Design a protein with these regions (language model features):
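Acidic, surface-exposed loops and disordered segments
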Residues: 1-173
Length: 173
């Protein structure tokens, strides 16, 4: 099977991570792949903030868990890297552009043997005063909104196999 297709068909969301860090070379490759995502009219609306400090990750995780409605949850599953993807809301394809950044990062991580998962609620996090303060601290302009998180690390357990695809996902008209 073609290497790219194999990567796309075998990638799974990892929801339990080892504490070992992701090597800088691999992390940089995943981030670069994100910057090469397709985007509307080449406007490159996405922006990636990379968190590796456990205290920073814990702060964001607490915010995410509260939005989720379960303050005791650990929605980042112990991942040692959390990448927050923002996009410039002045670009009319900002949601799509930011989503494709995450998609590229997920595929790139898998191709390098790094586990990953898309975590939602970024938009809500950065609409909060605490989130806006973080954006300011990180130098992310107010015109940006959170699209999602791409968590990265090495899987502590083998991800579940893919569910069979629904028969009606493709309609040939």
């Amino acid at each position: 099977m073609n290497e790219v297709l194999n990567c796309l068909l075998t990638r799974r969301s990892v929801k339990k991570y080892l504490p070992q860090p992701v090597e800088q070379e691999k992390l940089d490759a995943v981030l670069e792949a994100g910057t090469y995502a397709a985007c509307g009219m080449g406007r490159q609306a996405g922006k990636i903030v990379v968190l590796q400090n456990p205290d920073d990750i814990a702060q964001l995780e607490r915010m995410n868990a509260a939005i989720f409605g379960n303050p005791d949850a650990h929605p980042f599953y112990g991942a040692p890297v959390v990448c927050v993807v923002f996009a410039d809301t002045n670009v009319n394809t900002w949601i799509e552009d930011g989503s494709l950044v995450i998609g590229n990062m997920l595929a790139a991580a898998h191709s390098l043997g790094v586990g990953s998962c898309w975590i939602h609620r970024a938009r809500q996090e950065f609409e909060l005063p605490e989130g806006k303060a973080l954006m300011q601290k990180w130098g992310v302009g107010a015109q940006y909104a959170g699209v999602g998180h791409c968590i990265l690390g090495y899987a502590a357990a083998e991800p579940a196999p893919a569910k069979p695809r629904k028969a009606d996902l493709i309609i040939r008209a």
